[in-house]
From Swiss-Prot:
UniProt entry tagged with the keyword Mitochondrion: no
Short name of any one Pfam family annotated for the protein: NTP_transferase
UniProt key word Chaperone: no
Subunit structure of this chain's protein: Homotetramer.
Reaction it catalyzes: alpha-D-glucose 1-phosphate + ATP + H(+) = ADP-alpha-D-glucose + diphosphate
Residues reported in the UniProt entry to bind alpha-D-glucose 1-phosphate: G164, E179, K180, S197
Superkingdom in the source lineage: Bacteria
UniProt pathway: Glycan biosynthesis; glycogen biosynthesis
EC number of this enzyme: 2.7.7.27
UniProt-recorded Gene Ontology molecular function terms: ATP binding; glucose-1-phosphate adenylyltransferase activity
Uppermost EC category: transferase
Record organism: Corynebacterium kroppenstedtii (strain DSM 44385 / JCM 11950 / CIP 105744 / CCUG 35717)
The name this protein goes by in its record: Glucose-1-phosphate adenylyltransferase
Gene of this entry: glgC
Source lineage: Bacteria, Bacillati, Actinomycetota, Actinomycetes, Mycobacteriales
Length: 411
């Protein structure tokens, strides 16, 4: 393992994820399945572990059972070596109240910092799809002498109005942090792009503690990391931007270098899946030099295709059975069954979905354990779909967890 300063990683995983409804109706956003075999939180945890950061606290709150279980079952490290990835629910250490913001979540968890006594603290979000080497950011943070570093991704200025935007000088010192500005600032070296905050931070420990305590005394604060804590450091001239375009991950290609996606809406979530199944995806799941880790599916049998069942341009996870059915341009999670004569096209099917004989499912996302009856139709009649399900702005049909759709002959 590479020699490193003493670092504690904190992952903020308490988000409700309302824009991903109905897939967050029963789980926290970081626990939403992604890419057939993963959960959203697997990406940030993989980045930390691949970089050698093995002391990780995941702060949870909203409907966290699924997330807690996934972390406990899939991310067991060697306690003998002092390594851990542990979910930490709201402890109510500062009174009988829940987290009121991301900064308050860390404030209420200061005991974790005091117990570990790190030199530096990584604070990352839990619900983005990307590869990143956090060690490079920590090293740059130390060399900069700043108290706070913010990872910034270069985006076209005309598209940056939906982000927290960073204005920095030539040496990377952040001079202004603007939340969703109408006129985003340009980067020092390119007038057509701006630095958008990725929600990933590195702090010198005592500086973060001081900022959190001062923020807690401000009755007008939203106690938010991006909205309050980062501006605190910017105003003091103590914030530095880490240019994500310079973060190089082993095994990456020119095509997927710098890939980062906020999949916080249904349409963004769907489009990220459709990228995965393209011939040359922008994001490569198959980079073995910087793998995305998740639960071990070795207890599931391999996917099986029988009676002429086929899958084209698709990702099919372990335990799936395609029996005389057809799957095209889709992502199937573990244990999905597609029966005789059924057609699945342009879909994301999560764990345990069953598609009945002769059913047609198109342009849809089906949550875990959905049952689609024989000859039933989804994504064929928009008016009918809108009566039964949620439709995204882009027209993606969203079928909630455990839903049972009767077959055509049962209506």
């Amino acid at each position: 393992m590479r020699s490193q300063p003493h670092v504690l990683s904190i992952v903020l995983a308490g988000g409700e994820g309302k824009r991903l409804f109905p897939f967050t109706a029963d789980r926290a956003k970081p626990a939403v399945p992604f890419g057939g075999s993963y959960r959203l939180i697997d990406f940030v945890l993989s980045n930390l572990v691949n970089a050698g950061y093995m002391k990780v606290c995941v702060l949870t709150q909203y409907k966290s059972h699924s997330l807690d279980r996934h972390i406990s079952q899939s991310w067991q490290l060697s306690g003998l070596a002092g390594e851990y990835i542990t979910p930490v629910p709201a402890q109510q250490r500062l009174g009988k109240r829940w987290f009121t913001g991301s900064a308050d979540a860390i404030l209420q968890s200061l005991n974790l910092i005091y117990d570990e006594d790190p030199e530096y603290i990584i604070v990352f979000g839990a619900d983005h799809v990307y590869r990143m080497d956090p060690e490079q950011m920590v090293k740059e943070h130390i060399e900069s002498g700043a108290a706070c570093s913010v990872a910034g991704i270069r985006v076209p200025r005309k598209e940056a109005t939906a982000f927290g935007c960073i204005q920095a000088d030539d040496d990377g010192t952040i001079t202004e942090f603007l939340e969703k500005p109408a006129d985003p600032p340009a980067t020092p070296d390119d007038p057509d792009v701006t630095f958008a905050s990725m929600g990933n931070y590195v702090f010198t420990t005592q500086a973060l503690i001081d900022a959190l305590k001062e923020d807690s005394e401000d009755e007008n604060s939203a106690h938010d990391m991006g909205g309050n804590i980062i501006p605190y450091f910017v105003n003091r001239g103590e914030a530095h931007v880490h240019d994500f375009s310079r973060n190089v991950v082993p095994g990456e290609t020119d095509r997927d270098h710098g890939y980062w996606r906020d999949v916080g809406t249904v349409d963004a979530f769907y489009e990220a899946h459709m990228d995965l199944i393209s011939v040359y995806p922008v994001f490569n799941l198959y980079n073995r030099k910087w793998p995305i880790h998740t639960s071990d599916d070795s207890n599931l049998p391999p996917a099986k295709f029988v009676k002429g069942g086929i899958a084209q341009s698709s990702i099919v996870a372990a335990g799936c059975i395609i029996s005389a059915g057809t799957v095209r341009n889709s992502v199937l999670g573990p244990g999905v069954v597609v029966e005789e004569g059924a057609s699945v096209e342009g879909c994301v099917l999560m764990d345990g979905v069953r598609i009945g004989k002769g059913a047609v499912v198109r342009h849809a996302i089906l949550d875990k354990n959905v049952r689609v009856g024989d000859n039933a139709l989804i994504g064929v009649d928009r008016a009918r779909d809108s009566e039964r399900f949620t439709l995204s702005q882009g027209g993606v049909v969203c079928v909630p967890k455990n839903y049972e759709l009767h077959g055509a002959d049962e209506d």
